[in-house]
Amino acid sequence: MEPKARCSDSQRGGPCTNHEPPALEEGGRRHRRARAGSSSGALGLQLRPRVRPQRRAAAAAAAAAAAAAAATAASAAASAILGGRAAAAQPIGHPDALERAARANLRARRGDAWRGRGAPQRRAPAEARALGAASRALARRGAAPAAPLRGQPGPALPPPGPEAEPALPGGGQLAVAGPAAPEAPGLGLGGGLDPVRPRGGGRTRGHPRGAGPGVRRGGLLGRGNLPHIGGGHIPLGLVFLVQPAAGGRALLLDQPAVAG
């Protein structure tokens, strides 16, 4: 009986890490990594299905067509709801537009962390800069009333007449943010604008026990839900579709062009 083939590891007295037991080998010299590449044992057949390029292209085309159809339906719904005003404006059909803006604001604040402890307070966030630009553009055109402070109601809107906008599907309501917004605590709209305040809190900012005075967690826009759009923490002239059936998420429908 011939001696079994032994590798260098087993000759030193350690376990054999490079070869399988001789009963499972072919001649005692087959490498373990050669068996690991085949998924069906000794046959070496690959059981993973290969993706056909035609099917991949067809799936991509179907996804693009579905996205285009959804965008068309959203723009048509916005035009029907706003009475054609969305056609001359800049529609934003993405339902998470508020959340994306809040995340961009958070990234801008985090980018200033290397400047020091008080840098996020000295530099205005992206929403505040956009709000200031919109207010100055409207003031140059003579169409911006004086923005009241927080807690003071904005100018009252006239009662709806017979030419009121039709009821929205799903029991939604239109909400216009800015100085002309009515007092609607049920919708989370406080009316008027809120001046930009320092966040405070220092290094523990963002923690529920470490937040200092004047802190609004989550940025100026919050996460896009109803409790976070109250008090006028959003730029002027934004039109939202508030859908209670969708968990109270506010859908940004219309953003007028305010650049002078």
From Swiss-Prot:
This is POLG alternative reading frame. The keyword Nucleus applies. Keywords: Nucleus, Secreted. Residues 36-48, 116-154, 164-186 have a biased composition (Low complexity). One of its GO terms (cellular component) is extracellular space. Residues 104-130 are annotated as: Required for nucleolar localization. The keyword Cell division does not apply. It comes from the Eukaryota. Interacts with C1QBP; the interaction results in nucleolar localization of C1QBP, probably due to prevention of C1QBP maturation and redirection from mitochondria to nucleoli. Transmembrane segments: none annotated. It comes from Homo sapiens (Human). Residues 187-199, 209-219 have a biased composition (Gly residues). Undergoes proteolytic cleavage to produce a secreted C-terminal fragment. Residues 1-50, 108-219 are annotated as: Disordered.
